[in-house]
């Protein structure tokens, strides 16, 4: 058996096509969705991520609002930029690129984001809304995972799902999304304190790995035919001395799984598509 690859790039492209239509409809009402980014410092990796987000914006017709500050920007300067974006009617959502320089209070910065303009869907208020089942921006990566599975006709209702990783960005909110009545999956949230991890993953129809541990999920840890989602991304140094990114799923899993969301080309493009979706939805709400 060789796993069917669930292509996040192709699915994200379909979503962008749909967003273009929605953005055009907004334009007919005189509304242009706007995504803001706040970048402090000149870290090449962070700059690349931000540039990618703005390329995505250009592809679907979303306006870009870039706010860039030097690495030595004060807390007050950063706070002022966030206050400006919170008040700007042209900004329907924005993100603060992490990590921030050490002298800045990251938690303070993130909590200053207007929850209605929280494009990442990770503001404490919006996570609380998710817990309570209230509408609000959804966390991009978990939402992207659910959307990718749904669009590939992976049955979620009644499915046994093992989520490996309890981070606030993926694992915890993903469990909340999957247990909504619209999905109705049964979720086991595994983590570093889980005893006999393999017992939980082998019992699952769907295994989603977001632990940041290269090659954590091996072929013997899943039931043949299971759906596997690789969310992990870790930079490792290969035998040639060159750096490369690898996921949490051992390559041999492709010979056992029924379907695989790979890394790269799986969850990453979906996360970016969901960021745009959150912004467009905010613009549609007015």
UniProtKB/Swiss-Prot annotation:
One of its GO terms (biological process) is purine nucleotide biosynthetic process. Pfam families: THF_DHG_CYH (PF00763), THF_DHG_CYH_C (PF02882). It comes from the Bacteria. NADP(+) binds at residues 165-167, 192, 233. Signal peptide: none annotated. GO terms for molecular function: methenyltetrahydrofolate cyclohydrolase activity; methylenetetrahydrofolate dehydrogenase (NADP+) activity. Its EC number is 1.5.1.5, 3.5.4.9. Keywords: Amino-acid biosynthesis, Histidine biosynthesis, Hydrolase, Methionine biosynthesis, Multifunctional enzyme, NADP, One-carbon metabolism, Oxidoreductase, Purine biosynthesis. Pathway: One-carbon metabolism; tetrahydrofolate interconversion. Transmembrane segments: none annotated. Gene3D superfamilies: Leucine Dehydrogenase, chain A, domain 1, NAD(P)-binding Rossmann-like Domain. InterPro entries: Aminoacid_DH-like_N_sf, NAD(P)-bd_dom_sf, THF_DH/CycHdrlase, THF_DH/CycHdrlase_cat_dom, THF_DH/CycHdrlase_NAD-bd_dom. GO terms for cellular component: cytosol. The keyword Oxidoreductase applies. The keyword Hydrolase applies. NCBIfam families: PRK14193.1 (NF010789). Homodimer. Catalyzes the oxidation of 5,10-methylenetetrahydrofolate to 5,10-methenyltetrahydrofolate and then the hydrolysis of 5,10-methenyltetrahydrofolate to 10-formyltetrahydrofolate. Belongs to the tetrahydrofolate dehydrogenase/cyclohydrolase family. This is Bifunctional protein FolD 2. The lineage of its organism: Bacteria, Bacillati, Actinomycetota, Actinomycetes, Micromonosporales. The gene is folD2.
